[in-house]
């Protein structure tokens, strides 16, 4: 999935995907605040990981990282309440369309085909009404496969590009959903091709791999949200692997055997070993 980290045009000298240039600009211009959607959420992790990869500690650099609801991101950038933000589409595209921002890097540049959203329920619901939960999961499987077809991108943009859903224009949504990015800031265009935002990818996208959870917990330690790693058994407690496998079989969806495979993070050329998350948690 490709999501942008846009910044106001005042930081456009940072270029696209250039960590050295971005670091130089951030250190010179000293932005006081950057935004993400929710503390500990994926967009928070992408932003903090990007800064870490440049050797920038937001506290030492005097950068406040603050939560802003996704639909309010552009207005906060436009009003200079923040100088940049990490959020899902189409709010990155809006900054480009309005000429107020550019895409500095996308989450696909950080970690290709990374995990994102999850279906989360209470233990009570999962235990007391498994039939309804299974129906919801089957519906999601069906929707994911439909959304993954490039031919359905225009219709998807029209369906969700209305006030009661995303409240953005279909034009803002469609190009990024298709993986065709105008980066803004005079940085040209980029076509992500097969690395565009995906929803199924033969069952790979929807697979709740324990390694993903362990990677996130390691980042929580790196970024100061946790003082130490929880027991790794927590992954098995939180992920209902047996239920997923059962519903996937009903839907004819392949369950990958990569749940504990190493993860390759492109941005800083690291490999995460899920059997030893402490190694990642201890990394500067």
Predicted regions and their residues:
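A bilobed periplasmic-binding-protein/Venus flytrap-type ligand-binding module shared by bacterial periplasmic
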Residues: 1-2, 115-131, 146
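Short, glycine-/small- and polar/acidic-enriched structural segments
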Residues: 1-66, 76-93, 100-113, 264-277, ...
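Short coil/loop linkers at secondary-structure junctions
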Residues: 57-61, 101, 166-167, 226, ...
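Ligand-binding pocket segment of bilobal, Venus flytrap-like solute-binding proteins
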Residues: 63, 67-103, 122, 158-165, ...
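A polyampholytic, Gly/Pro-enriched intrinsically disordered region
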Residues: 83-88, 125-130, 135
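Short gly/pro-enriched beta-turn/loop segments at secondary-structure junctions
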Residues: 113-114, 155
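Secondary-structure end/capping motifs
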Residues: 128-239
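Conserved C-terminal helix/tail region of periplasmic/extracytoplasmic solute-binding proteins
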Residues: 214-284
